[in-house]
């Protein structure tokens, strides 16, 4: 892995500093109460799962993902989209809870891949094993149709050797602290995606590995704000940055800048979104009545809320609730949908 051509430009240095500053602030803040953090993590997890599977062509909305997650115990998923979401959700939970116990080795990568595709019927033959057929990367339109080859990946023959070299580079570079941990993660991911070691699921696995690398490097706020949704919102730029760097990886001096800048800006967006959410939570809780806090708790847990829901939950009068809802809408903490009897409220 040729990293000598990485240029630490003033903008890149500024991004690294801003992200690290937030990492330090998060650790010292004590941030929010555990139940508030759990609510944030739940929302971020739903966004991450929805976005990461949609980037690959799934059509499930965040709302459908949320409904599916509430039925995970059933272990019966009819569509391919549902199978992919279920696998992604389980691996995300594993990473969040056990990131200190998952060394990034060939065995663990294959285990994560096997778990990721656990419910995917069409992937039964190859899950948990490196590819045996070529799998050049295509770009997909919103209908899920392939609209062209983005780049050619490693051959099945070269894949085991290339992965062994990449994993050795990762282990050595982390142990010797030769590079900033965010740059290590970026270099690993772009190489992993250029090799594309598994027959399918590489994109999803790369985003799970990004989270794992960040958590292991001490960026413990990552589960509370979705990086995947930032990437989904700039999908064209994501593919372009990947392609611009990946096509140079075998050159004497690879061009790392497009990918490094894309990923660092995405990480900047991720932490800024979280800072806004935390500030909004703090402000909300310091200024709100007990009833308003209960309404916000309910909508975070259920995705939506009606006056009838809160009459049932709190016993408050409809008139008091209507006034409280109006206040929350005014403060831009909730948004009103529908009208009349079918009015409901959701988070912005």
State where each predicted segment sits.
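FIC/Doc superfamily catalytic core
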Residues: 1-348
């Amino acid at each position: 892995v040729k990293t000598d051509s990485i240029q630490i430009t003033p903008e890149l240095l500024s991004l690294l500093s801003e992200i690290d500053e937030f990492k330090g602030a998060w650790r010292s803040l004590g941030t929010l109460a555990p139940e508030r953090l759990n609510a944030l993590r739940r929302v971020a997890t739903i966004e991450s799962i929805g976005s990461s599977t949609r980037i690959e062509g799934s059509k499930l909305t965040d709302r459908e993902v949320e409904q599916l997650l509430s039925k995970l115990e059933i272990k019966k998923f009819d569509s391919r989209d549902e199978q992919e979401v279920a696998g992604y959700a389980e691996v995300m939970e594993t990473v969040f809870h056990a990131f200190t116990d998952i060394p990034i080795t060939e065995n663990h990568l294959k285990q994560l891949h096997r778990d990721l595709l656990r419910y995917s019927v069409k992937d039964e033959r190859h899950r948990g094993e490196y590819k045996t057929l070529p799998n050049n990367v295509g770009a997909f339109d919103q209908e899920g149709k392939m609209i062209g080859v983005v780049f050619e990946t490693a051959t099945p023959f070269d894949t085991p050797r290339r992965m062994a070299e990449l994993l050795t580079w990762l282990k050595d570079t982390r142990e010797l602290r030769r590079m900033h941990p965010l740059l290590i993660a970026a270099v690993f991911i772009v190489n992993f995606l250029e090799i594309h070691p598994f027959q399918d699921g590489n994109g999803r696995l790369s985003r799970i590995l990004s989270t794992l690398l960040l958590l292991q490097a001490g960026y413990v706020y990552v589960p509370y704000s979705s990086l995947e949704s930032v990437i989904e919102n700039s999908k064209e730029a994501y593919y372009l940055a990947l392609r611009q760097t990946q096509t140079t990886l075998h050159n004497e001096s690879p061009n790392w800048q497009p990918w490094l800048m894309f990923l660092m800006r995405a990480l900047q967006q991720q932490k800024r979104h979280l800072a806004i959410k935390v500030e909004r939570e703090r402000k909300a809780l310091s200024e709100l009545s007990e009833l308003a806090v209960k309404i916000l708790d309910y909508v975070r847990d259920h995705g939506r809320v009606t006056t009838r829901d809160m009459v049932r939950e709190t016993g408050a009068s409809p008139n008091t609730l209507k006034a409280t809802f109006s206040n929350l809408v005014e403060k831009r903490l909730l948004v009103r949908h529908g009208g009349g009897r079918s009015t409901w409220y959701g988070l912005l």
